[in-house]
Design a protein with these regions (language model features):
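Exported/periplasmic ABC-transporter solute-binding proteins
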Residues: 1-170
Length: 170
């Protein structure tokens, strides 16, 4: 299973070997953005998320939370989850976008590592597939923009297309 589309160079390599690859969507996944339950912030727009994860916003007080430096957590760069979040949240779907994660972002090896860090750090924010959500983290509601409805990451909202950080799995 993969959380990203087949890359052009992968298709070309397969064809060189006589294989004609194709994708089959087998599931949908929502990427939950999570904070520690002690964090009072419960909703953010995609623009606010982009500003946090790129380092433009560095303190929770700017988002209505405590005066505390934001600790950014991300999956490692070779993770499909990392790539999807960068392309669809930081770069807002712009294929020519240059936005990157903040230099101080902590790159962790697994979604479970992000879940554990968020559970123990009141200033942390991270993201992972909805299946990792538990009561030791708080999933925040996300809106496409400040004029849109804030939507919680849950199965119904992913299936209906309401949740803005959803992706197919292949």
């Amino acid at each position: 299973m993969s959380s990203r589309n087949i890359k052009g160079k992968e298709i070309a390599l397969a064809k060189q070997k006589g294989i004609n690859p194709f994708e089959i969507k087998v599931a949908l996944d929502g990427l939950a953005v999570v904070v520690n339950p002690a964090n009072s912030v419960s909703k953010l727009t995609l623009d606010q998320l982009a500003d946090i994860f790129t380092g433009k916003i560095t303190n929770w007080k700017d988002m209505g939370g405590k005066d505390e430096k934001i600790v950014i957590l991300s999956r490692e760069v070779n993770s499909g989850t990392h790539v999807y979040f960068k392309e669809h949240v930081l770069r807002k779907g712009d294929a020519n976008g240059k936005e990157e994660f903040a230099p101080g972002a902590l790159l962790l090896s697994s979604s479970q590592a992000i879940a554990d860090e968020v559970a123990g750090n009141s200033a942390a924010i991270g993201y992972y597939g909805m299946g990792y959500i538990c009561n030791k983290q708080k999933a925040i509601a996300v809106a496409k923009d400040n004029k849109s409805e804030y939507v919680n990451p849950n199965i119904d909202n992913v299936l209906s297309g309401k949740y803005p950080i959803s992706r197919p799995l292949f």
